[in-house]
Amino acid sequence: MTEKVSSSLRESPTARWVVLILVSFTMMCMYYLTDAMAPLQQQLQSNLHWSATDYGFFTSGYGWFNVFLLMLVFSGIILDKIGTRFTGILAIFIMLVGAGIKYWAISGHFSGLFGLNIFSWHILSETPLSAIMAGFGFGVFGVGCEMFGIAANKAVVRWFRGKEMALAIGLNTSTGRIGTALAMFTPLPLYNLTKNVSAPILLSVLLLCIGLLVFIFFAVLDKRLDKEEADAGISKEEEFKVSDIRDIAQNRAFWYIAILCVLFYSAVFPFIKFATNLIVQKYTVPDLFAGYIPALLPFSALLLTPLFGGISDKKGKAASIMILGSILLVCVHLLFSIPSLNSFPIAIGLVILLGIAFSLVPSAMWPSVAKIIPHSKLGTAYAMIFWVQNIGLMLVPLLIGYVLDKYCIIGTITKIVDGKEQHLTQYNYTIPMLIFACFGFVAIIFAYLLKAEDKKKGYGLEKPNVVE
């Protein structure tokens, strides 16, 4: 029996890394679709007559169903009950449906429905129906996106447990960041080429279809691993029970990680959504090139997340790494908030530093969850963390959009956009940056609490991941 186990796919470095490539490629396609509209904030506002609040409302749609309908929690239960393969494929189909709704809402097809100009409709006070429908589609997409995220994490943990787990999770995360980086600088040239603000969504759907085919290949390998483990007499994991949710919720370290997660990501992902407009307005970078600077964030994360993950695998210190990343996050946003620091080389440097922070925390945080929660409950645990995270990702863009419109308008400028004269609102981003810095400061506190809890309970967060 020992012979069979030692020759299993999971013990083969080649098989493990092939699995990682397959899962990570689909993650990359998913992240591209998530952020494809971020560089087009100005075009959405001018073409669809949205305000910054409307744009924030649209981006907040990502978390509507995950938060209010608890779809993320159900996703985790589905994952632990039915498995990674089914959950991953289901998630991709849900993402495709959501992307289709989002495309319909933003494209001209929506405005011409039944011969009516629906872009002129307003419900929920002053929010255009186009923004509401786009947010609805983004919400459906968000259900699939978060479902796939937890499935991917559990898949990587399964194949790399006791091996290079932090490095693998870091590589998976950083490959996803390639999608974010591509979403920062390709949509605007694509818009200029097609004069269609929804064109990047079509490209995203095509990439996601390719990602589906790639993930099916992963499913074949994962099924083979199941068979090998069954033949080797390796017992299956415990079945999911509803009481597992209670057990997870009673774990104090779990909540420290969950709160740290929502605070940290609330200071990064909403920043990315508004970053291109910030770069244009504060640092006077031309629209065409403004997306290139925020793209440095995921690119630096791409290079550094595996590095820090490898350090965590060999040296440990995961809780300390999370503290360091949170401190760096605060410093970056405080520097972004200073009005006099307005030259574009400073913006480049700060985005790179933010990318380092963005590498430090996730490379240590996600492997740490696998140390405090049993593998049979891991899907539900990841889902609960992602649910808490989605509360922040839903509310913070709304908050930032509201603050910009309420307190940060400094005037308007007239520009020629697509041959038409447009009056564009100018914003001072100091207050939003201070809000992000506050999130980072509270994240530092919870990172210290997590380190203290680890010292008390002995989870081994400060110990290496690789079992010699």
Give the ranges of each region predicted by the language model.
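C-terminal transmembrane helical hairpin of 12-TM major facilitator-type secondary transporters
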Residues: 318-365
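Cytoplasmic helix-loop-helix junction between adjacent transmembrane helices
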Residues: 131, 137-175
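Central cavity-lining transmembrane alpha-helices of secondary-active solute carriers
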Residues: 60-77, 295-308
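Cytoplasmic membrane-interface "Motif A"-like loop-to-helix N-cap segments
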Residues: 80-92, 313-327
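C-terminal ends and interior cores of transmembrane alpha-helices
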Residues: 93-126, 327-341
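Juxtamembrane intracellular "pre-TM" segments in multi-pass secondary transporters
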Residues: 2-13, 225-257, 466-468
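Extracytoplasmic gate region of multi-pass secondary transporters
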Residues: 37-41, 251-305, 362, 366, ...
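Symmetry-related core transmembrane helices of the 12-TM Major Facilitator Superfamily/SLC fold
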Residues: 199-218, 430-448
